[in-house]
């Protein structure tokens, strides 16, 4: 089973080329784009996994709903409540932080405690129901990360906040999320630097080892030739 990854941007580390202001601006753009809806098809025993890069201490909310393919109508219809989805989430250290059975439509929530790539997997329990066995499901999934996971309308009603107070709270939480993203980028840069240094060190030691092997082979060949010539009384 291959994990389905999101779109990634690969390039020079922003910490090397960009100032703090530009970095914060780019992170704000990234935050504005975090989270989004998609749908995918899944078979009877098939598992679909997604990789999401998440900073530490960040809340993630996923909303999903399933549709079952109707062969007679040749279209997808809302799945019955008996059809469920099993959701499993693993952190970058491959530890399970969420494993739970949900219904045909539901919402799952978890908070990251380790920065890095989190694996979110879903698969159906269709094998338990002969009616659905062998059918094809369409799963609509919406994952929200960080402050995008907050329902500000609900927060405003619960805490009785004015429009200005709510906006200030949104800005504060956006700044906090930007700080988390910056810390995560620094962590990635540090990890990349350590990996590069380790690789360079291994290459250096391997080059030294190769040189020593070549020198040893050369010395052995010279001694072998000298012994050969002495045996033939050529020297």
UniProtKB/Swiss-Prot annotation:
Residues in coiled coil: 154-184
Annotated spans, Required for interaction with STX17: 121-160
Keyword Glycoprotein attached: yes
Keywords: Acetylation, Coiled coil, Endoplasmic reticulum, Glycoprotein, Golgi apparatus, Membrane, Protein transport, Signal, Transmembrane, Transmembrane helix, Transport
Record keyword Glycoprotein present: yes
GO cellular component: COPII-coated ER to Golgi transport vesicle; endoplasmic reticulum; endoplasmic reticulum membrane; endoplasmic reticulum-Golgi intermediate compartment; endoplasmic reticulum-Golgi intermediate compartment membrane; Golgi apparatus; Golgi membrane; synaptic vesicle
TM spans (from-to): 203-222
Residue window of motif COPII vesicle coat-binding: 228-229
Signal peptide (UniProt feature, chain positions): 1-37
Stated name of the protein: Transmembrane emp24 domain-containing protein 9
Organism: Rattus norvegicus
Gene this protein is translated from: Tmed9
């Amino acid at each position: 089973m291959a994990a389905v990854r999101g779109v990634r941007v690969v390039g020079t580390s922003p910490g090397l080329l960009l100032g703090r202001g530009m970095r914060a601006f780019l992170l704000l753009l990234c935050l504005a784009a975090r989270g989004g809806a998609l749908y995918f098809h899944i078979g009877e025993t098939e598992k679909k996994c997604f990789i999401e890069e998440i900073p530490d201490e960040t809340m993630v909310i996923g909303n999903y709903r399933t549709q079952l393919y109707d062969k007679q109508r040749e279209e997808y219809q809302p799945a019955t409540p008996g059809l469920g989805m099993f959701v499993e989430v693993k952190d970058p250290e491959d530890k399970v932080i969420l494993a739970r059975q949900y219904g045909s439509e539901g919402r799952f929530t978890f908070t990251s405690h380790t920065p890095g790539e989190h694996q979110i997997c879903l698969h159906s329990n269709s094998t338990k129901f002969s009616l659905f066995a062998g059918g094809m499901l369409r799963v609509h999934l919406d994952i929200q990360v960080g402050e995008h996971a907050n329902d500000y309308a609900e927060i405003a009603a619960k805490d009785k906040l004015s429009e200005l107070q709510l906006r200030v709270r949104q800005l504060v939480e956006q700044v906090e999320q930007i700080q988390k993203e910056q810390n995560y980028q620094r962590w990635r840069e540090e990890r990349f630097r350590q990996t590069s240094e380790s690789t360079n060190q291994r290459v250096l030691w391997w080059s030294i080892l190769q040189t020593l092997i070549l020198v040893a082979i050369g010395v052995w060949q010279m001694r072998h030739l000298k012994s050969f010539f002495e045996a033939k009384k050529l020297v």
